[in-house]
Amino acid sequence: MSVATSTNSAPPSSLSDIAQQFASGNPIISINPLGNGNINSTFLVQTNPIATAPQRFVLQRINAQVFRQPELVIQNMAVLTEHLKNNAAPAGRRWETPAIVTTQSGKNYWQDSAGEYWRAISFIENAQPVETIQNVEHAREIGYGLARFHHLISTLNTDRLADTLEGFHITPTYLATYERTKQQADLTSKTSSDIETKQRQHCLDFIAQRQEWAHVLENAKASGQLKLRPIHGDPKVNNILLSKNGQAVSLIDLDTLKPGLIH
């Protein structure tokens, strides 16, 4: 078996043992780092079932420094998987959502001897991310993927979802932190270069010109004009996978699935 590790991965022996928990008893052919995410440690595991072709799944160690309650991330994923069983995408166009791969004992996660939480999800085959918008058609597909996913989860009751990153999208909170930091900082430091000074002033001006809008969404939520809906909290361009013909086929990185404002 081939095991390639990254600098933030678990030791090869324990990584193999953990992957085996999700492999349904099948031999593991390889384990390799997957993607360029900065939060979780992510690996692509390939197994070799006796009766079928090789199969692959994604293995992740959830970063408990970011997600303080990893079990809630996994719980949300389980709720999503269950919801989509009865709310499949319309026929006529491919669309897939990663689903939970359970352990041999039927659990949604595995906790190792160090207390780390590991989970496995299905791998979306024949699709890949693109880091930046390439053209108008690509932008259209990104929009389609974002809309398709949120249409599918629109009937999911937000009471069933935990808020895995409380305050993640609350702009006034960030603005308040910025104001405190600005008051404490020495903005007249003579050690900065002219370029740094201009860049800093550009940022200060940018925020000053827009800060009156920072409370709009939260005020609308408080007044009942907007309500919480199930959302993907981090729908970056490279979280939408494209098929070989350029069509959006999946929205991945579902750790930030949570109640929020879709606006």
Language model features: what each stretch is:
Residues 1-32, 80:
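Juxta-kinase regulatory segment immediately upstream of eukaryotic protein kinase catalytic domains
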